[in-house]
């Protein structure tokens, strides 16, 4: 670019003179003329052609409908040198320059993040010894994920207890920035949790054995090494097990609002409109954040920094440091599985307290638990050959096709469930993976609505009081630790989740099964 800066490189913001560029119309949007030869619009995506960024190994692809496409183009048009993050389009192209990359992708909910966009997917082929693993391609909240529990309650059963249940959930499940639980784990317990994940809770009778079956990786990633997790990271996680955190993390009590695929829904134990479910969205808390920070520092301080974007600096997967990060990341991921499991324990106990029935009698079974910030070793069919890859999913959900051997037997006929949370006060969705998704996205789909504006802009433009009042008008019981921050998570700060999941379905990468509507929202 004419300014001479390196796109995406994090640096101190300096005053810059606006750069005047010749603009052209591109499918109803204005873009700099220099980009036009490298962009191609399809009915479900934007193709970023090799050459948009110097060093791209191949084309990149961003899934979008017309409205989401317009957001991407406006962001690209208005990106400024000196910003902390590049535009989502540029970030997706930047990832296509990484060593060993097969393809860089962005899901419809994608928005700018550290290194990879949030919503980014990339697979690196492991028959290339230089193939990298990139902390910026996983994110700071390692194994941020979401789980759904079902019940045999209906909305009419829960309506008289909404206030009582909302108050009890807020009391029993700590939430908010830096929140701690009433339990401080010993060093031995920390090691066990980071090694065993959800299995540790099962041994302690804090989770059901069947929960393991309905959790991605059975709630435990085997190739982990807790001893690679720093004391600083351990200190941050020691008293946070069973806590929700802040930001877009939440616990929601939801009703089934619409069923699009009854056969698939029944396989998940969802039988009718009005059925009550519980959705939990959180990750590895401060422990995972510190693990990421430790290895970002290690990568950035090495001599071979990424020349396109320093935030994409990684290490060869097969190197000593690559394996250290991978195993420490997996240890943090196991902590996250246990964290969601511990919150589920408190949810089950709270329902028992309010409804005077045991969780078993209330049919509080786990439907599924998915990761959406993780890097995994997987085998994918590339140009007719089975290739072992390291697949980065950052703000993206694994959604494997029917009959895949790693998904539970009950779901083999329908494909892996993918749980998609909406913005605060809007609907959420259950999707399943498809064969087309295996071909197009390495078996990946979206993870949520995706931010439309930053938290800072949301706080400036949206009134938190109006958000709280709007939730009341919708009949939603909101429990938020700091109501002043409600604007950060306002519906207007996010894309339309309906458009996101429908775009995924139109692209053939996942299929919508049912929709959920919130009745209670608990946030930090």
Curated annotation (Swiss-Prot):
Catalytic reaction equation(s): a 3'-end 3'-phospho-ribonucleotide-RNA + a 5'-end dephospho-ribonucleoside-RNA + GTP = a ribonucleotidyl-ribonucleotide-RNA + GMP + diphosphate; a 3'-end 2',3'-cyclophospho-ribonucleotide-RNA + a 5'-end dephospho-ribonucleoside-RNA + GTP + H2O = a ribonucleotidyl-ribonucleotide-RNA + GMP + diphosphate + H(+)
Keywords: GTP-binding, Ligase, Manganese, Metal-binding, Nucleotide-binding, tRNA processing
Residues annotated for GMP binding in this entry: 248-252, 372-373, 421-424, 428, 447-450, 523
A Pfam family assignment: RtcB
Cofactor(s) the protein needs: Mn(2+)
GO cellular component: nucleus; tRNA-splicing ligase complex
Cofactor annotation remark: Binds 2 manganese ions per subunit.
Classification via InterPro entries: RtcB (IPR001233), RtcB-like_sf (IPR036025), RtcB_euk (IPR027513)
EC number of the protein: 6.5.1.8
A GO biological process held by the record: tRNA splicing, via endonucleolytic cleavage and ligation
Active site, per annotation: 447
GO molecular function, one term: RNA ligase (ATP) activity
Residues bound to Mn(2+) 1: 141, 144, 249
Keyword rRNA-binding: no
Family in the record: Belongs to the RtcB family.
Oligomer status and interactors: Catalytic component of the tRNA-splicing ligase complex.
Role this protein plays: Catalytic subunit of the tRNA-splicing ligase complex that acts by directly joining spliced tRNA halves to mature-sized tRNAs by incorporating the precursor-derived splice junction phosphate into the mature tRNA as a canonical 3',5'-phosphodiester. May act as an RNA ligase with broad substrate specificity, and may function toward other RNAs.
Miscellaneous: Ligation probably proceeds through 3 nucleotidyl transfer steps, with 2',3'-cyclic phosphate termini being hydrolyzed to 3'-P termini in a step that precedes 3'-P activation with GMP. In the first nucleotidyl transfer step, RTCB reacts with GTP to form a covalent RTCB-histidine-GMP intermediate with release of PPi; in the second step, the GMP moiety is transferred to the RNA 3'-P; in the third step, the 5'-OH from the opposite RNA strand attacks the activated 3'-P to form a 3',5'-phosphodiester bond and release GMP.
Name of the featured protein: RNA-splicing ligase RtcB homolog 2
Species the sequence originates in: Entamoeba dispar (strain ATCC PRA-260 / SAW760)
């Amino acid at each position: 670019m004419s300014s001479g800066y390196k796109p995406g490189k994090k640096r101190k913001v300096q005053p810059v003179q606006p750069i005047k560029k010749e603009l052209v119309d591109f499918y109803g949007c204005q873009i700099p003329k220099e980009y036009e030869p490298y962009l191609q619009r399809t009915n479900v995506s934007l193709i970023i052609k090799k050459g948009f960024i110097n060093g791209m190994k191949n084309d990149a692809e961003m899934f979008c409908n017309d409205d989401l496409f317009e957001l991407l183009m406006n962001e690209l048009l208005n990106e400024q040198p000196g910003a902390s993050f590049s535009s989502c389009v540029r970030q997706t192209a930047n990832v296509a320059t990484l060593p060993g990359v097969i393809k860089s992708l962005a899901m419809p909910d994608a928005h700018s993040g550290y290194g990879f966009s949030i919503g980014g997917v990339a697979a690196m082929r492991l028959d290339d010894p230089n193939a990298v693993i990139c902390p910026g391609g996983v994110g700071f909240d390692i194994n941020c994920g979401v789980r759904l529990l079902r019940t045999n309650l209906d909305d009419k059963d829960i309506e008289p207890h909404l206030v009582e249940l909302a108050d009890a959930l807020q009391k029993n499940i700590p939430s908010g920035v830096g929140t701690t639980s009433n339990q401080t784990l010993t060093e031995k317990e920390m090691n066990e949790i980071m090694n065993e994940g959800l299995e540790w809770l099962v041994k302690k009778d804090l989770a059901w054995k069947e929960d393991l079956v309905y959790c991605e990786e059975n709630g435990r990633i085997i190739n982990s090494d807790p001893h690679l997790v720093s004391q600083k990271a351990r200190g941050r996680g020691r008293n946070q097990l069973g806590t929700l955190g802040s930001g877009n993390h939440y616990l929601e009590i939801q009703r089934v609002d619409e069923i699009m695929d009854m056969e698939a829904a029944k396989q998940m134990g969802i039988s009718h409109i009005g059925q009550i479910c519980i959705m939990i969205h959180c990750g590895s808390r401060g422990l995972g954040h510190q693990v990421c920070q430790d290895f970002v520092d290690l990568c950035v301080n090495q001599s071979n920094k990424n020349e396109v974007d320093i935030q994409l600096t990684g290490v060869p997967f097969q190197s000593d440091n690559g394996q250290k990060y991978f195993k420490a990341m997996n240890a943090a991921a196991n902590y996250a599985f246990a964290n969601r499991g511990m919150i589920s324990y408190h949810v089950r106990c709270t329902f028992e307290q309010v409804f005077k029935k045991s969780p078993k009698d209330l049919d509080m079974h786990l439907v599924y638990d998915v990761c959406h910030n993780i890097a995994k070793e997987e085998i994918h069919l590339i140009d007719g050959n089975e290739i072992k890859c390291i697949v980065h999913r950052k703000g993206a959900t694994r959604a494997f096709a029917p009959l895949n051997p790693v998904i539970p037997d009950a779901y083999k006929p329908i494909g892996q469930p993918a749980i998609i949370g909406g913005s605060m006060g809007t609907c959420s969705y259950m999707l399943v993976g498809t064969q087309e998704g295996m071909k197009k996205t390495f078996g990946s789909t979206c993870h949520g609505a995706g931010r439309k504006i930053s938290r800072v802009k949301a706080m400036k433009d949206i009134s938190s009081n109006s958000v709280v009042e709007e939730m009341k008008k919708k009949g939603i019981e909101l429990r938020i630790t700091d109501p002043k921050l409600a604007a950060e998570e306002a519906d207007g700060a996010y894309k339309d989740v309906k458009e996101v999941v429908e775009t995924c379905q139109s692209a053939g990468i996942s299929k919508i099964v049912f929709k959920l509507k919130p009745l209670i929202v608990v946030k930090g």
